[in-house]
Amino acid sequence: MNSTTTTDVNSIGDTYRYCEQLFKVIKVPAIVTLSGDLGSGKTTICKEIAKRFGHHQINSSSYQTVSFYSGVTNLIHCDFFRADLNERFFDDEIDPLLVGDWIILAEWCDSMPMNPNVQNITIRIINSDGSGKRTIITNIIS
């Protein structure tokens, strides 16, 4: 299945509702990549999705490239803003964490390899006009 949706959000409440709808279609294991300008809401979306998977205390990963949270569904939260990504990075840093049921939430990620064996979701956030309105383009490949 491959589907693309476009969602306009005008408030934090709209963002939370978007996350609630997204959570309903995520099938673990899953890779969710997020891209958008600084301050566009990537971390907010990650935190809201993480809460729905039972992880209530995740931090912004800006100073740590990969954070692992153990639970019923393990969460790997990545922030690649300052990272020098190459295939070895994924093999060495990410692959060892992929045990049990898991979800990867990867911010600033335009180069995370797609995995044909799991659900791949790409989220692109576009700041519309400086008023706080954003457009979220979501592509789901299952």
Located regions from the model:
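Conserved lysine of the Walker
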Residues: K42
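Short beta-strand-centered segment that lines the nucleotide-binding/catalytic pocket of NTP-utilizing
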Residues: H55-S70
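N-terminal pre-Walker A segment at the start of P-loop NTPase domains
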Residues: M1-Q21
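Short phosphate-coordinating micro-motif centered on Lys-Gly-acidic
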Residues: S3-T5, E87, D95-S142
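Phosphate-binding P-loop
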Residues: L22-P29
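P-loop (Walker A) phosphate-binding loop of NTP-binding proteins
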Residues: S35-D37
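Short hydrophobic/aromatic beta-strand immediately N-terminal to the Walker A/P-loop
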Residues: I31-T33
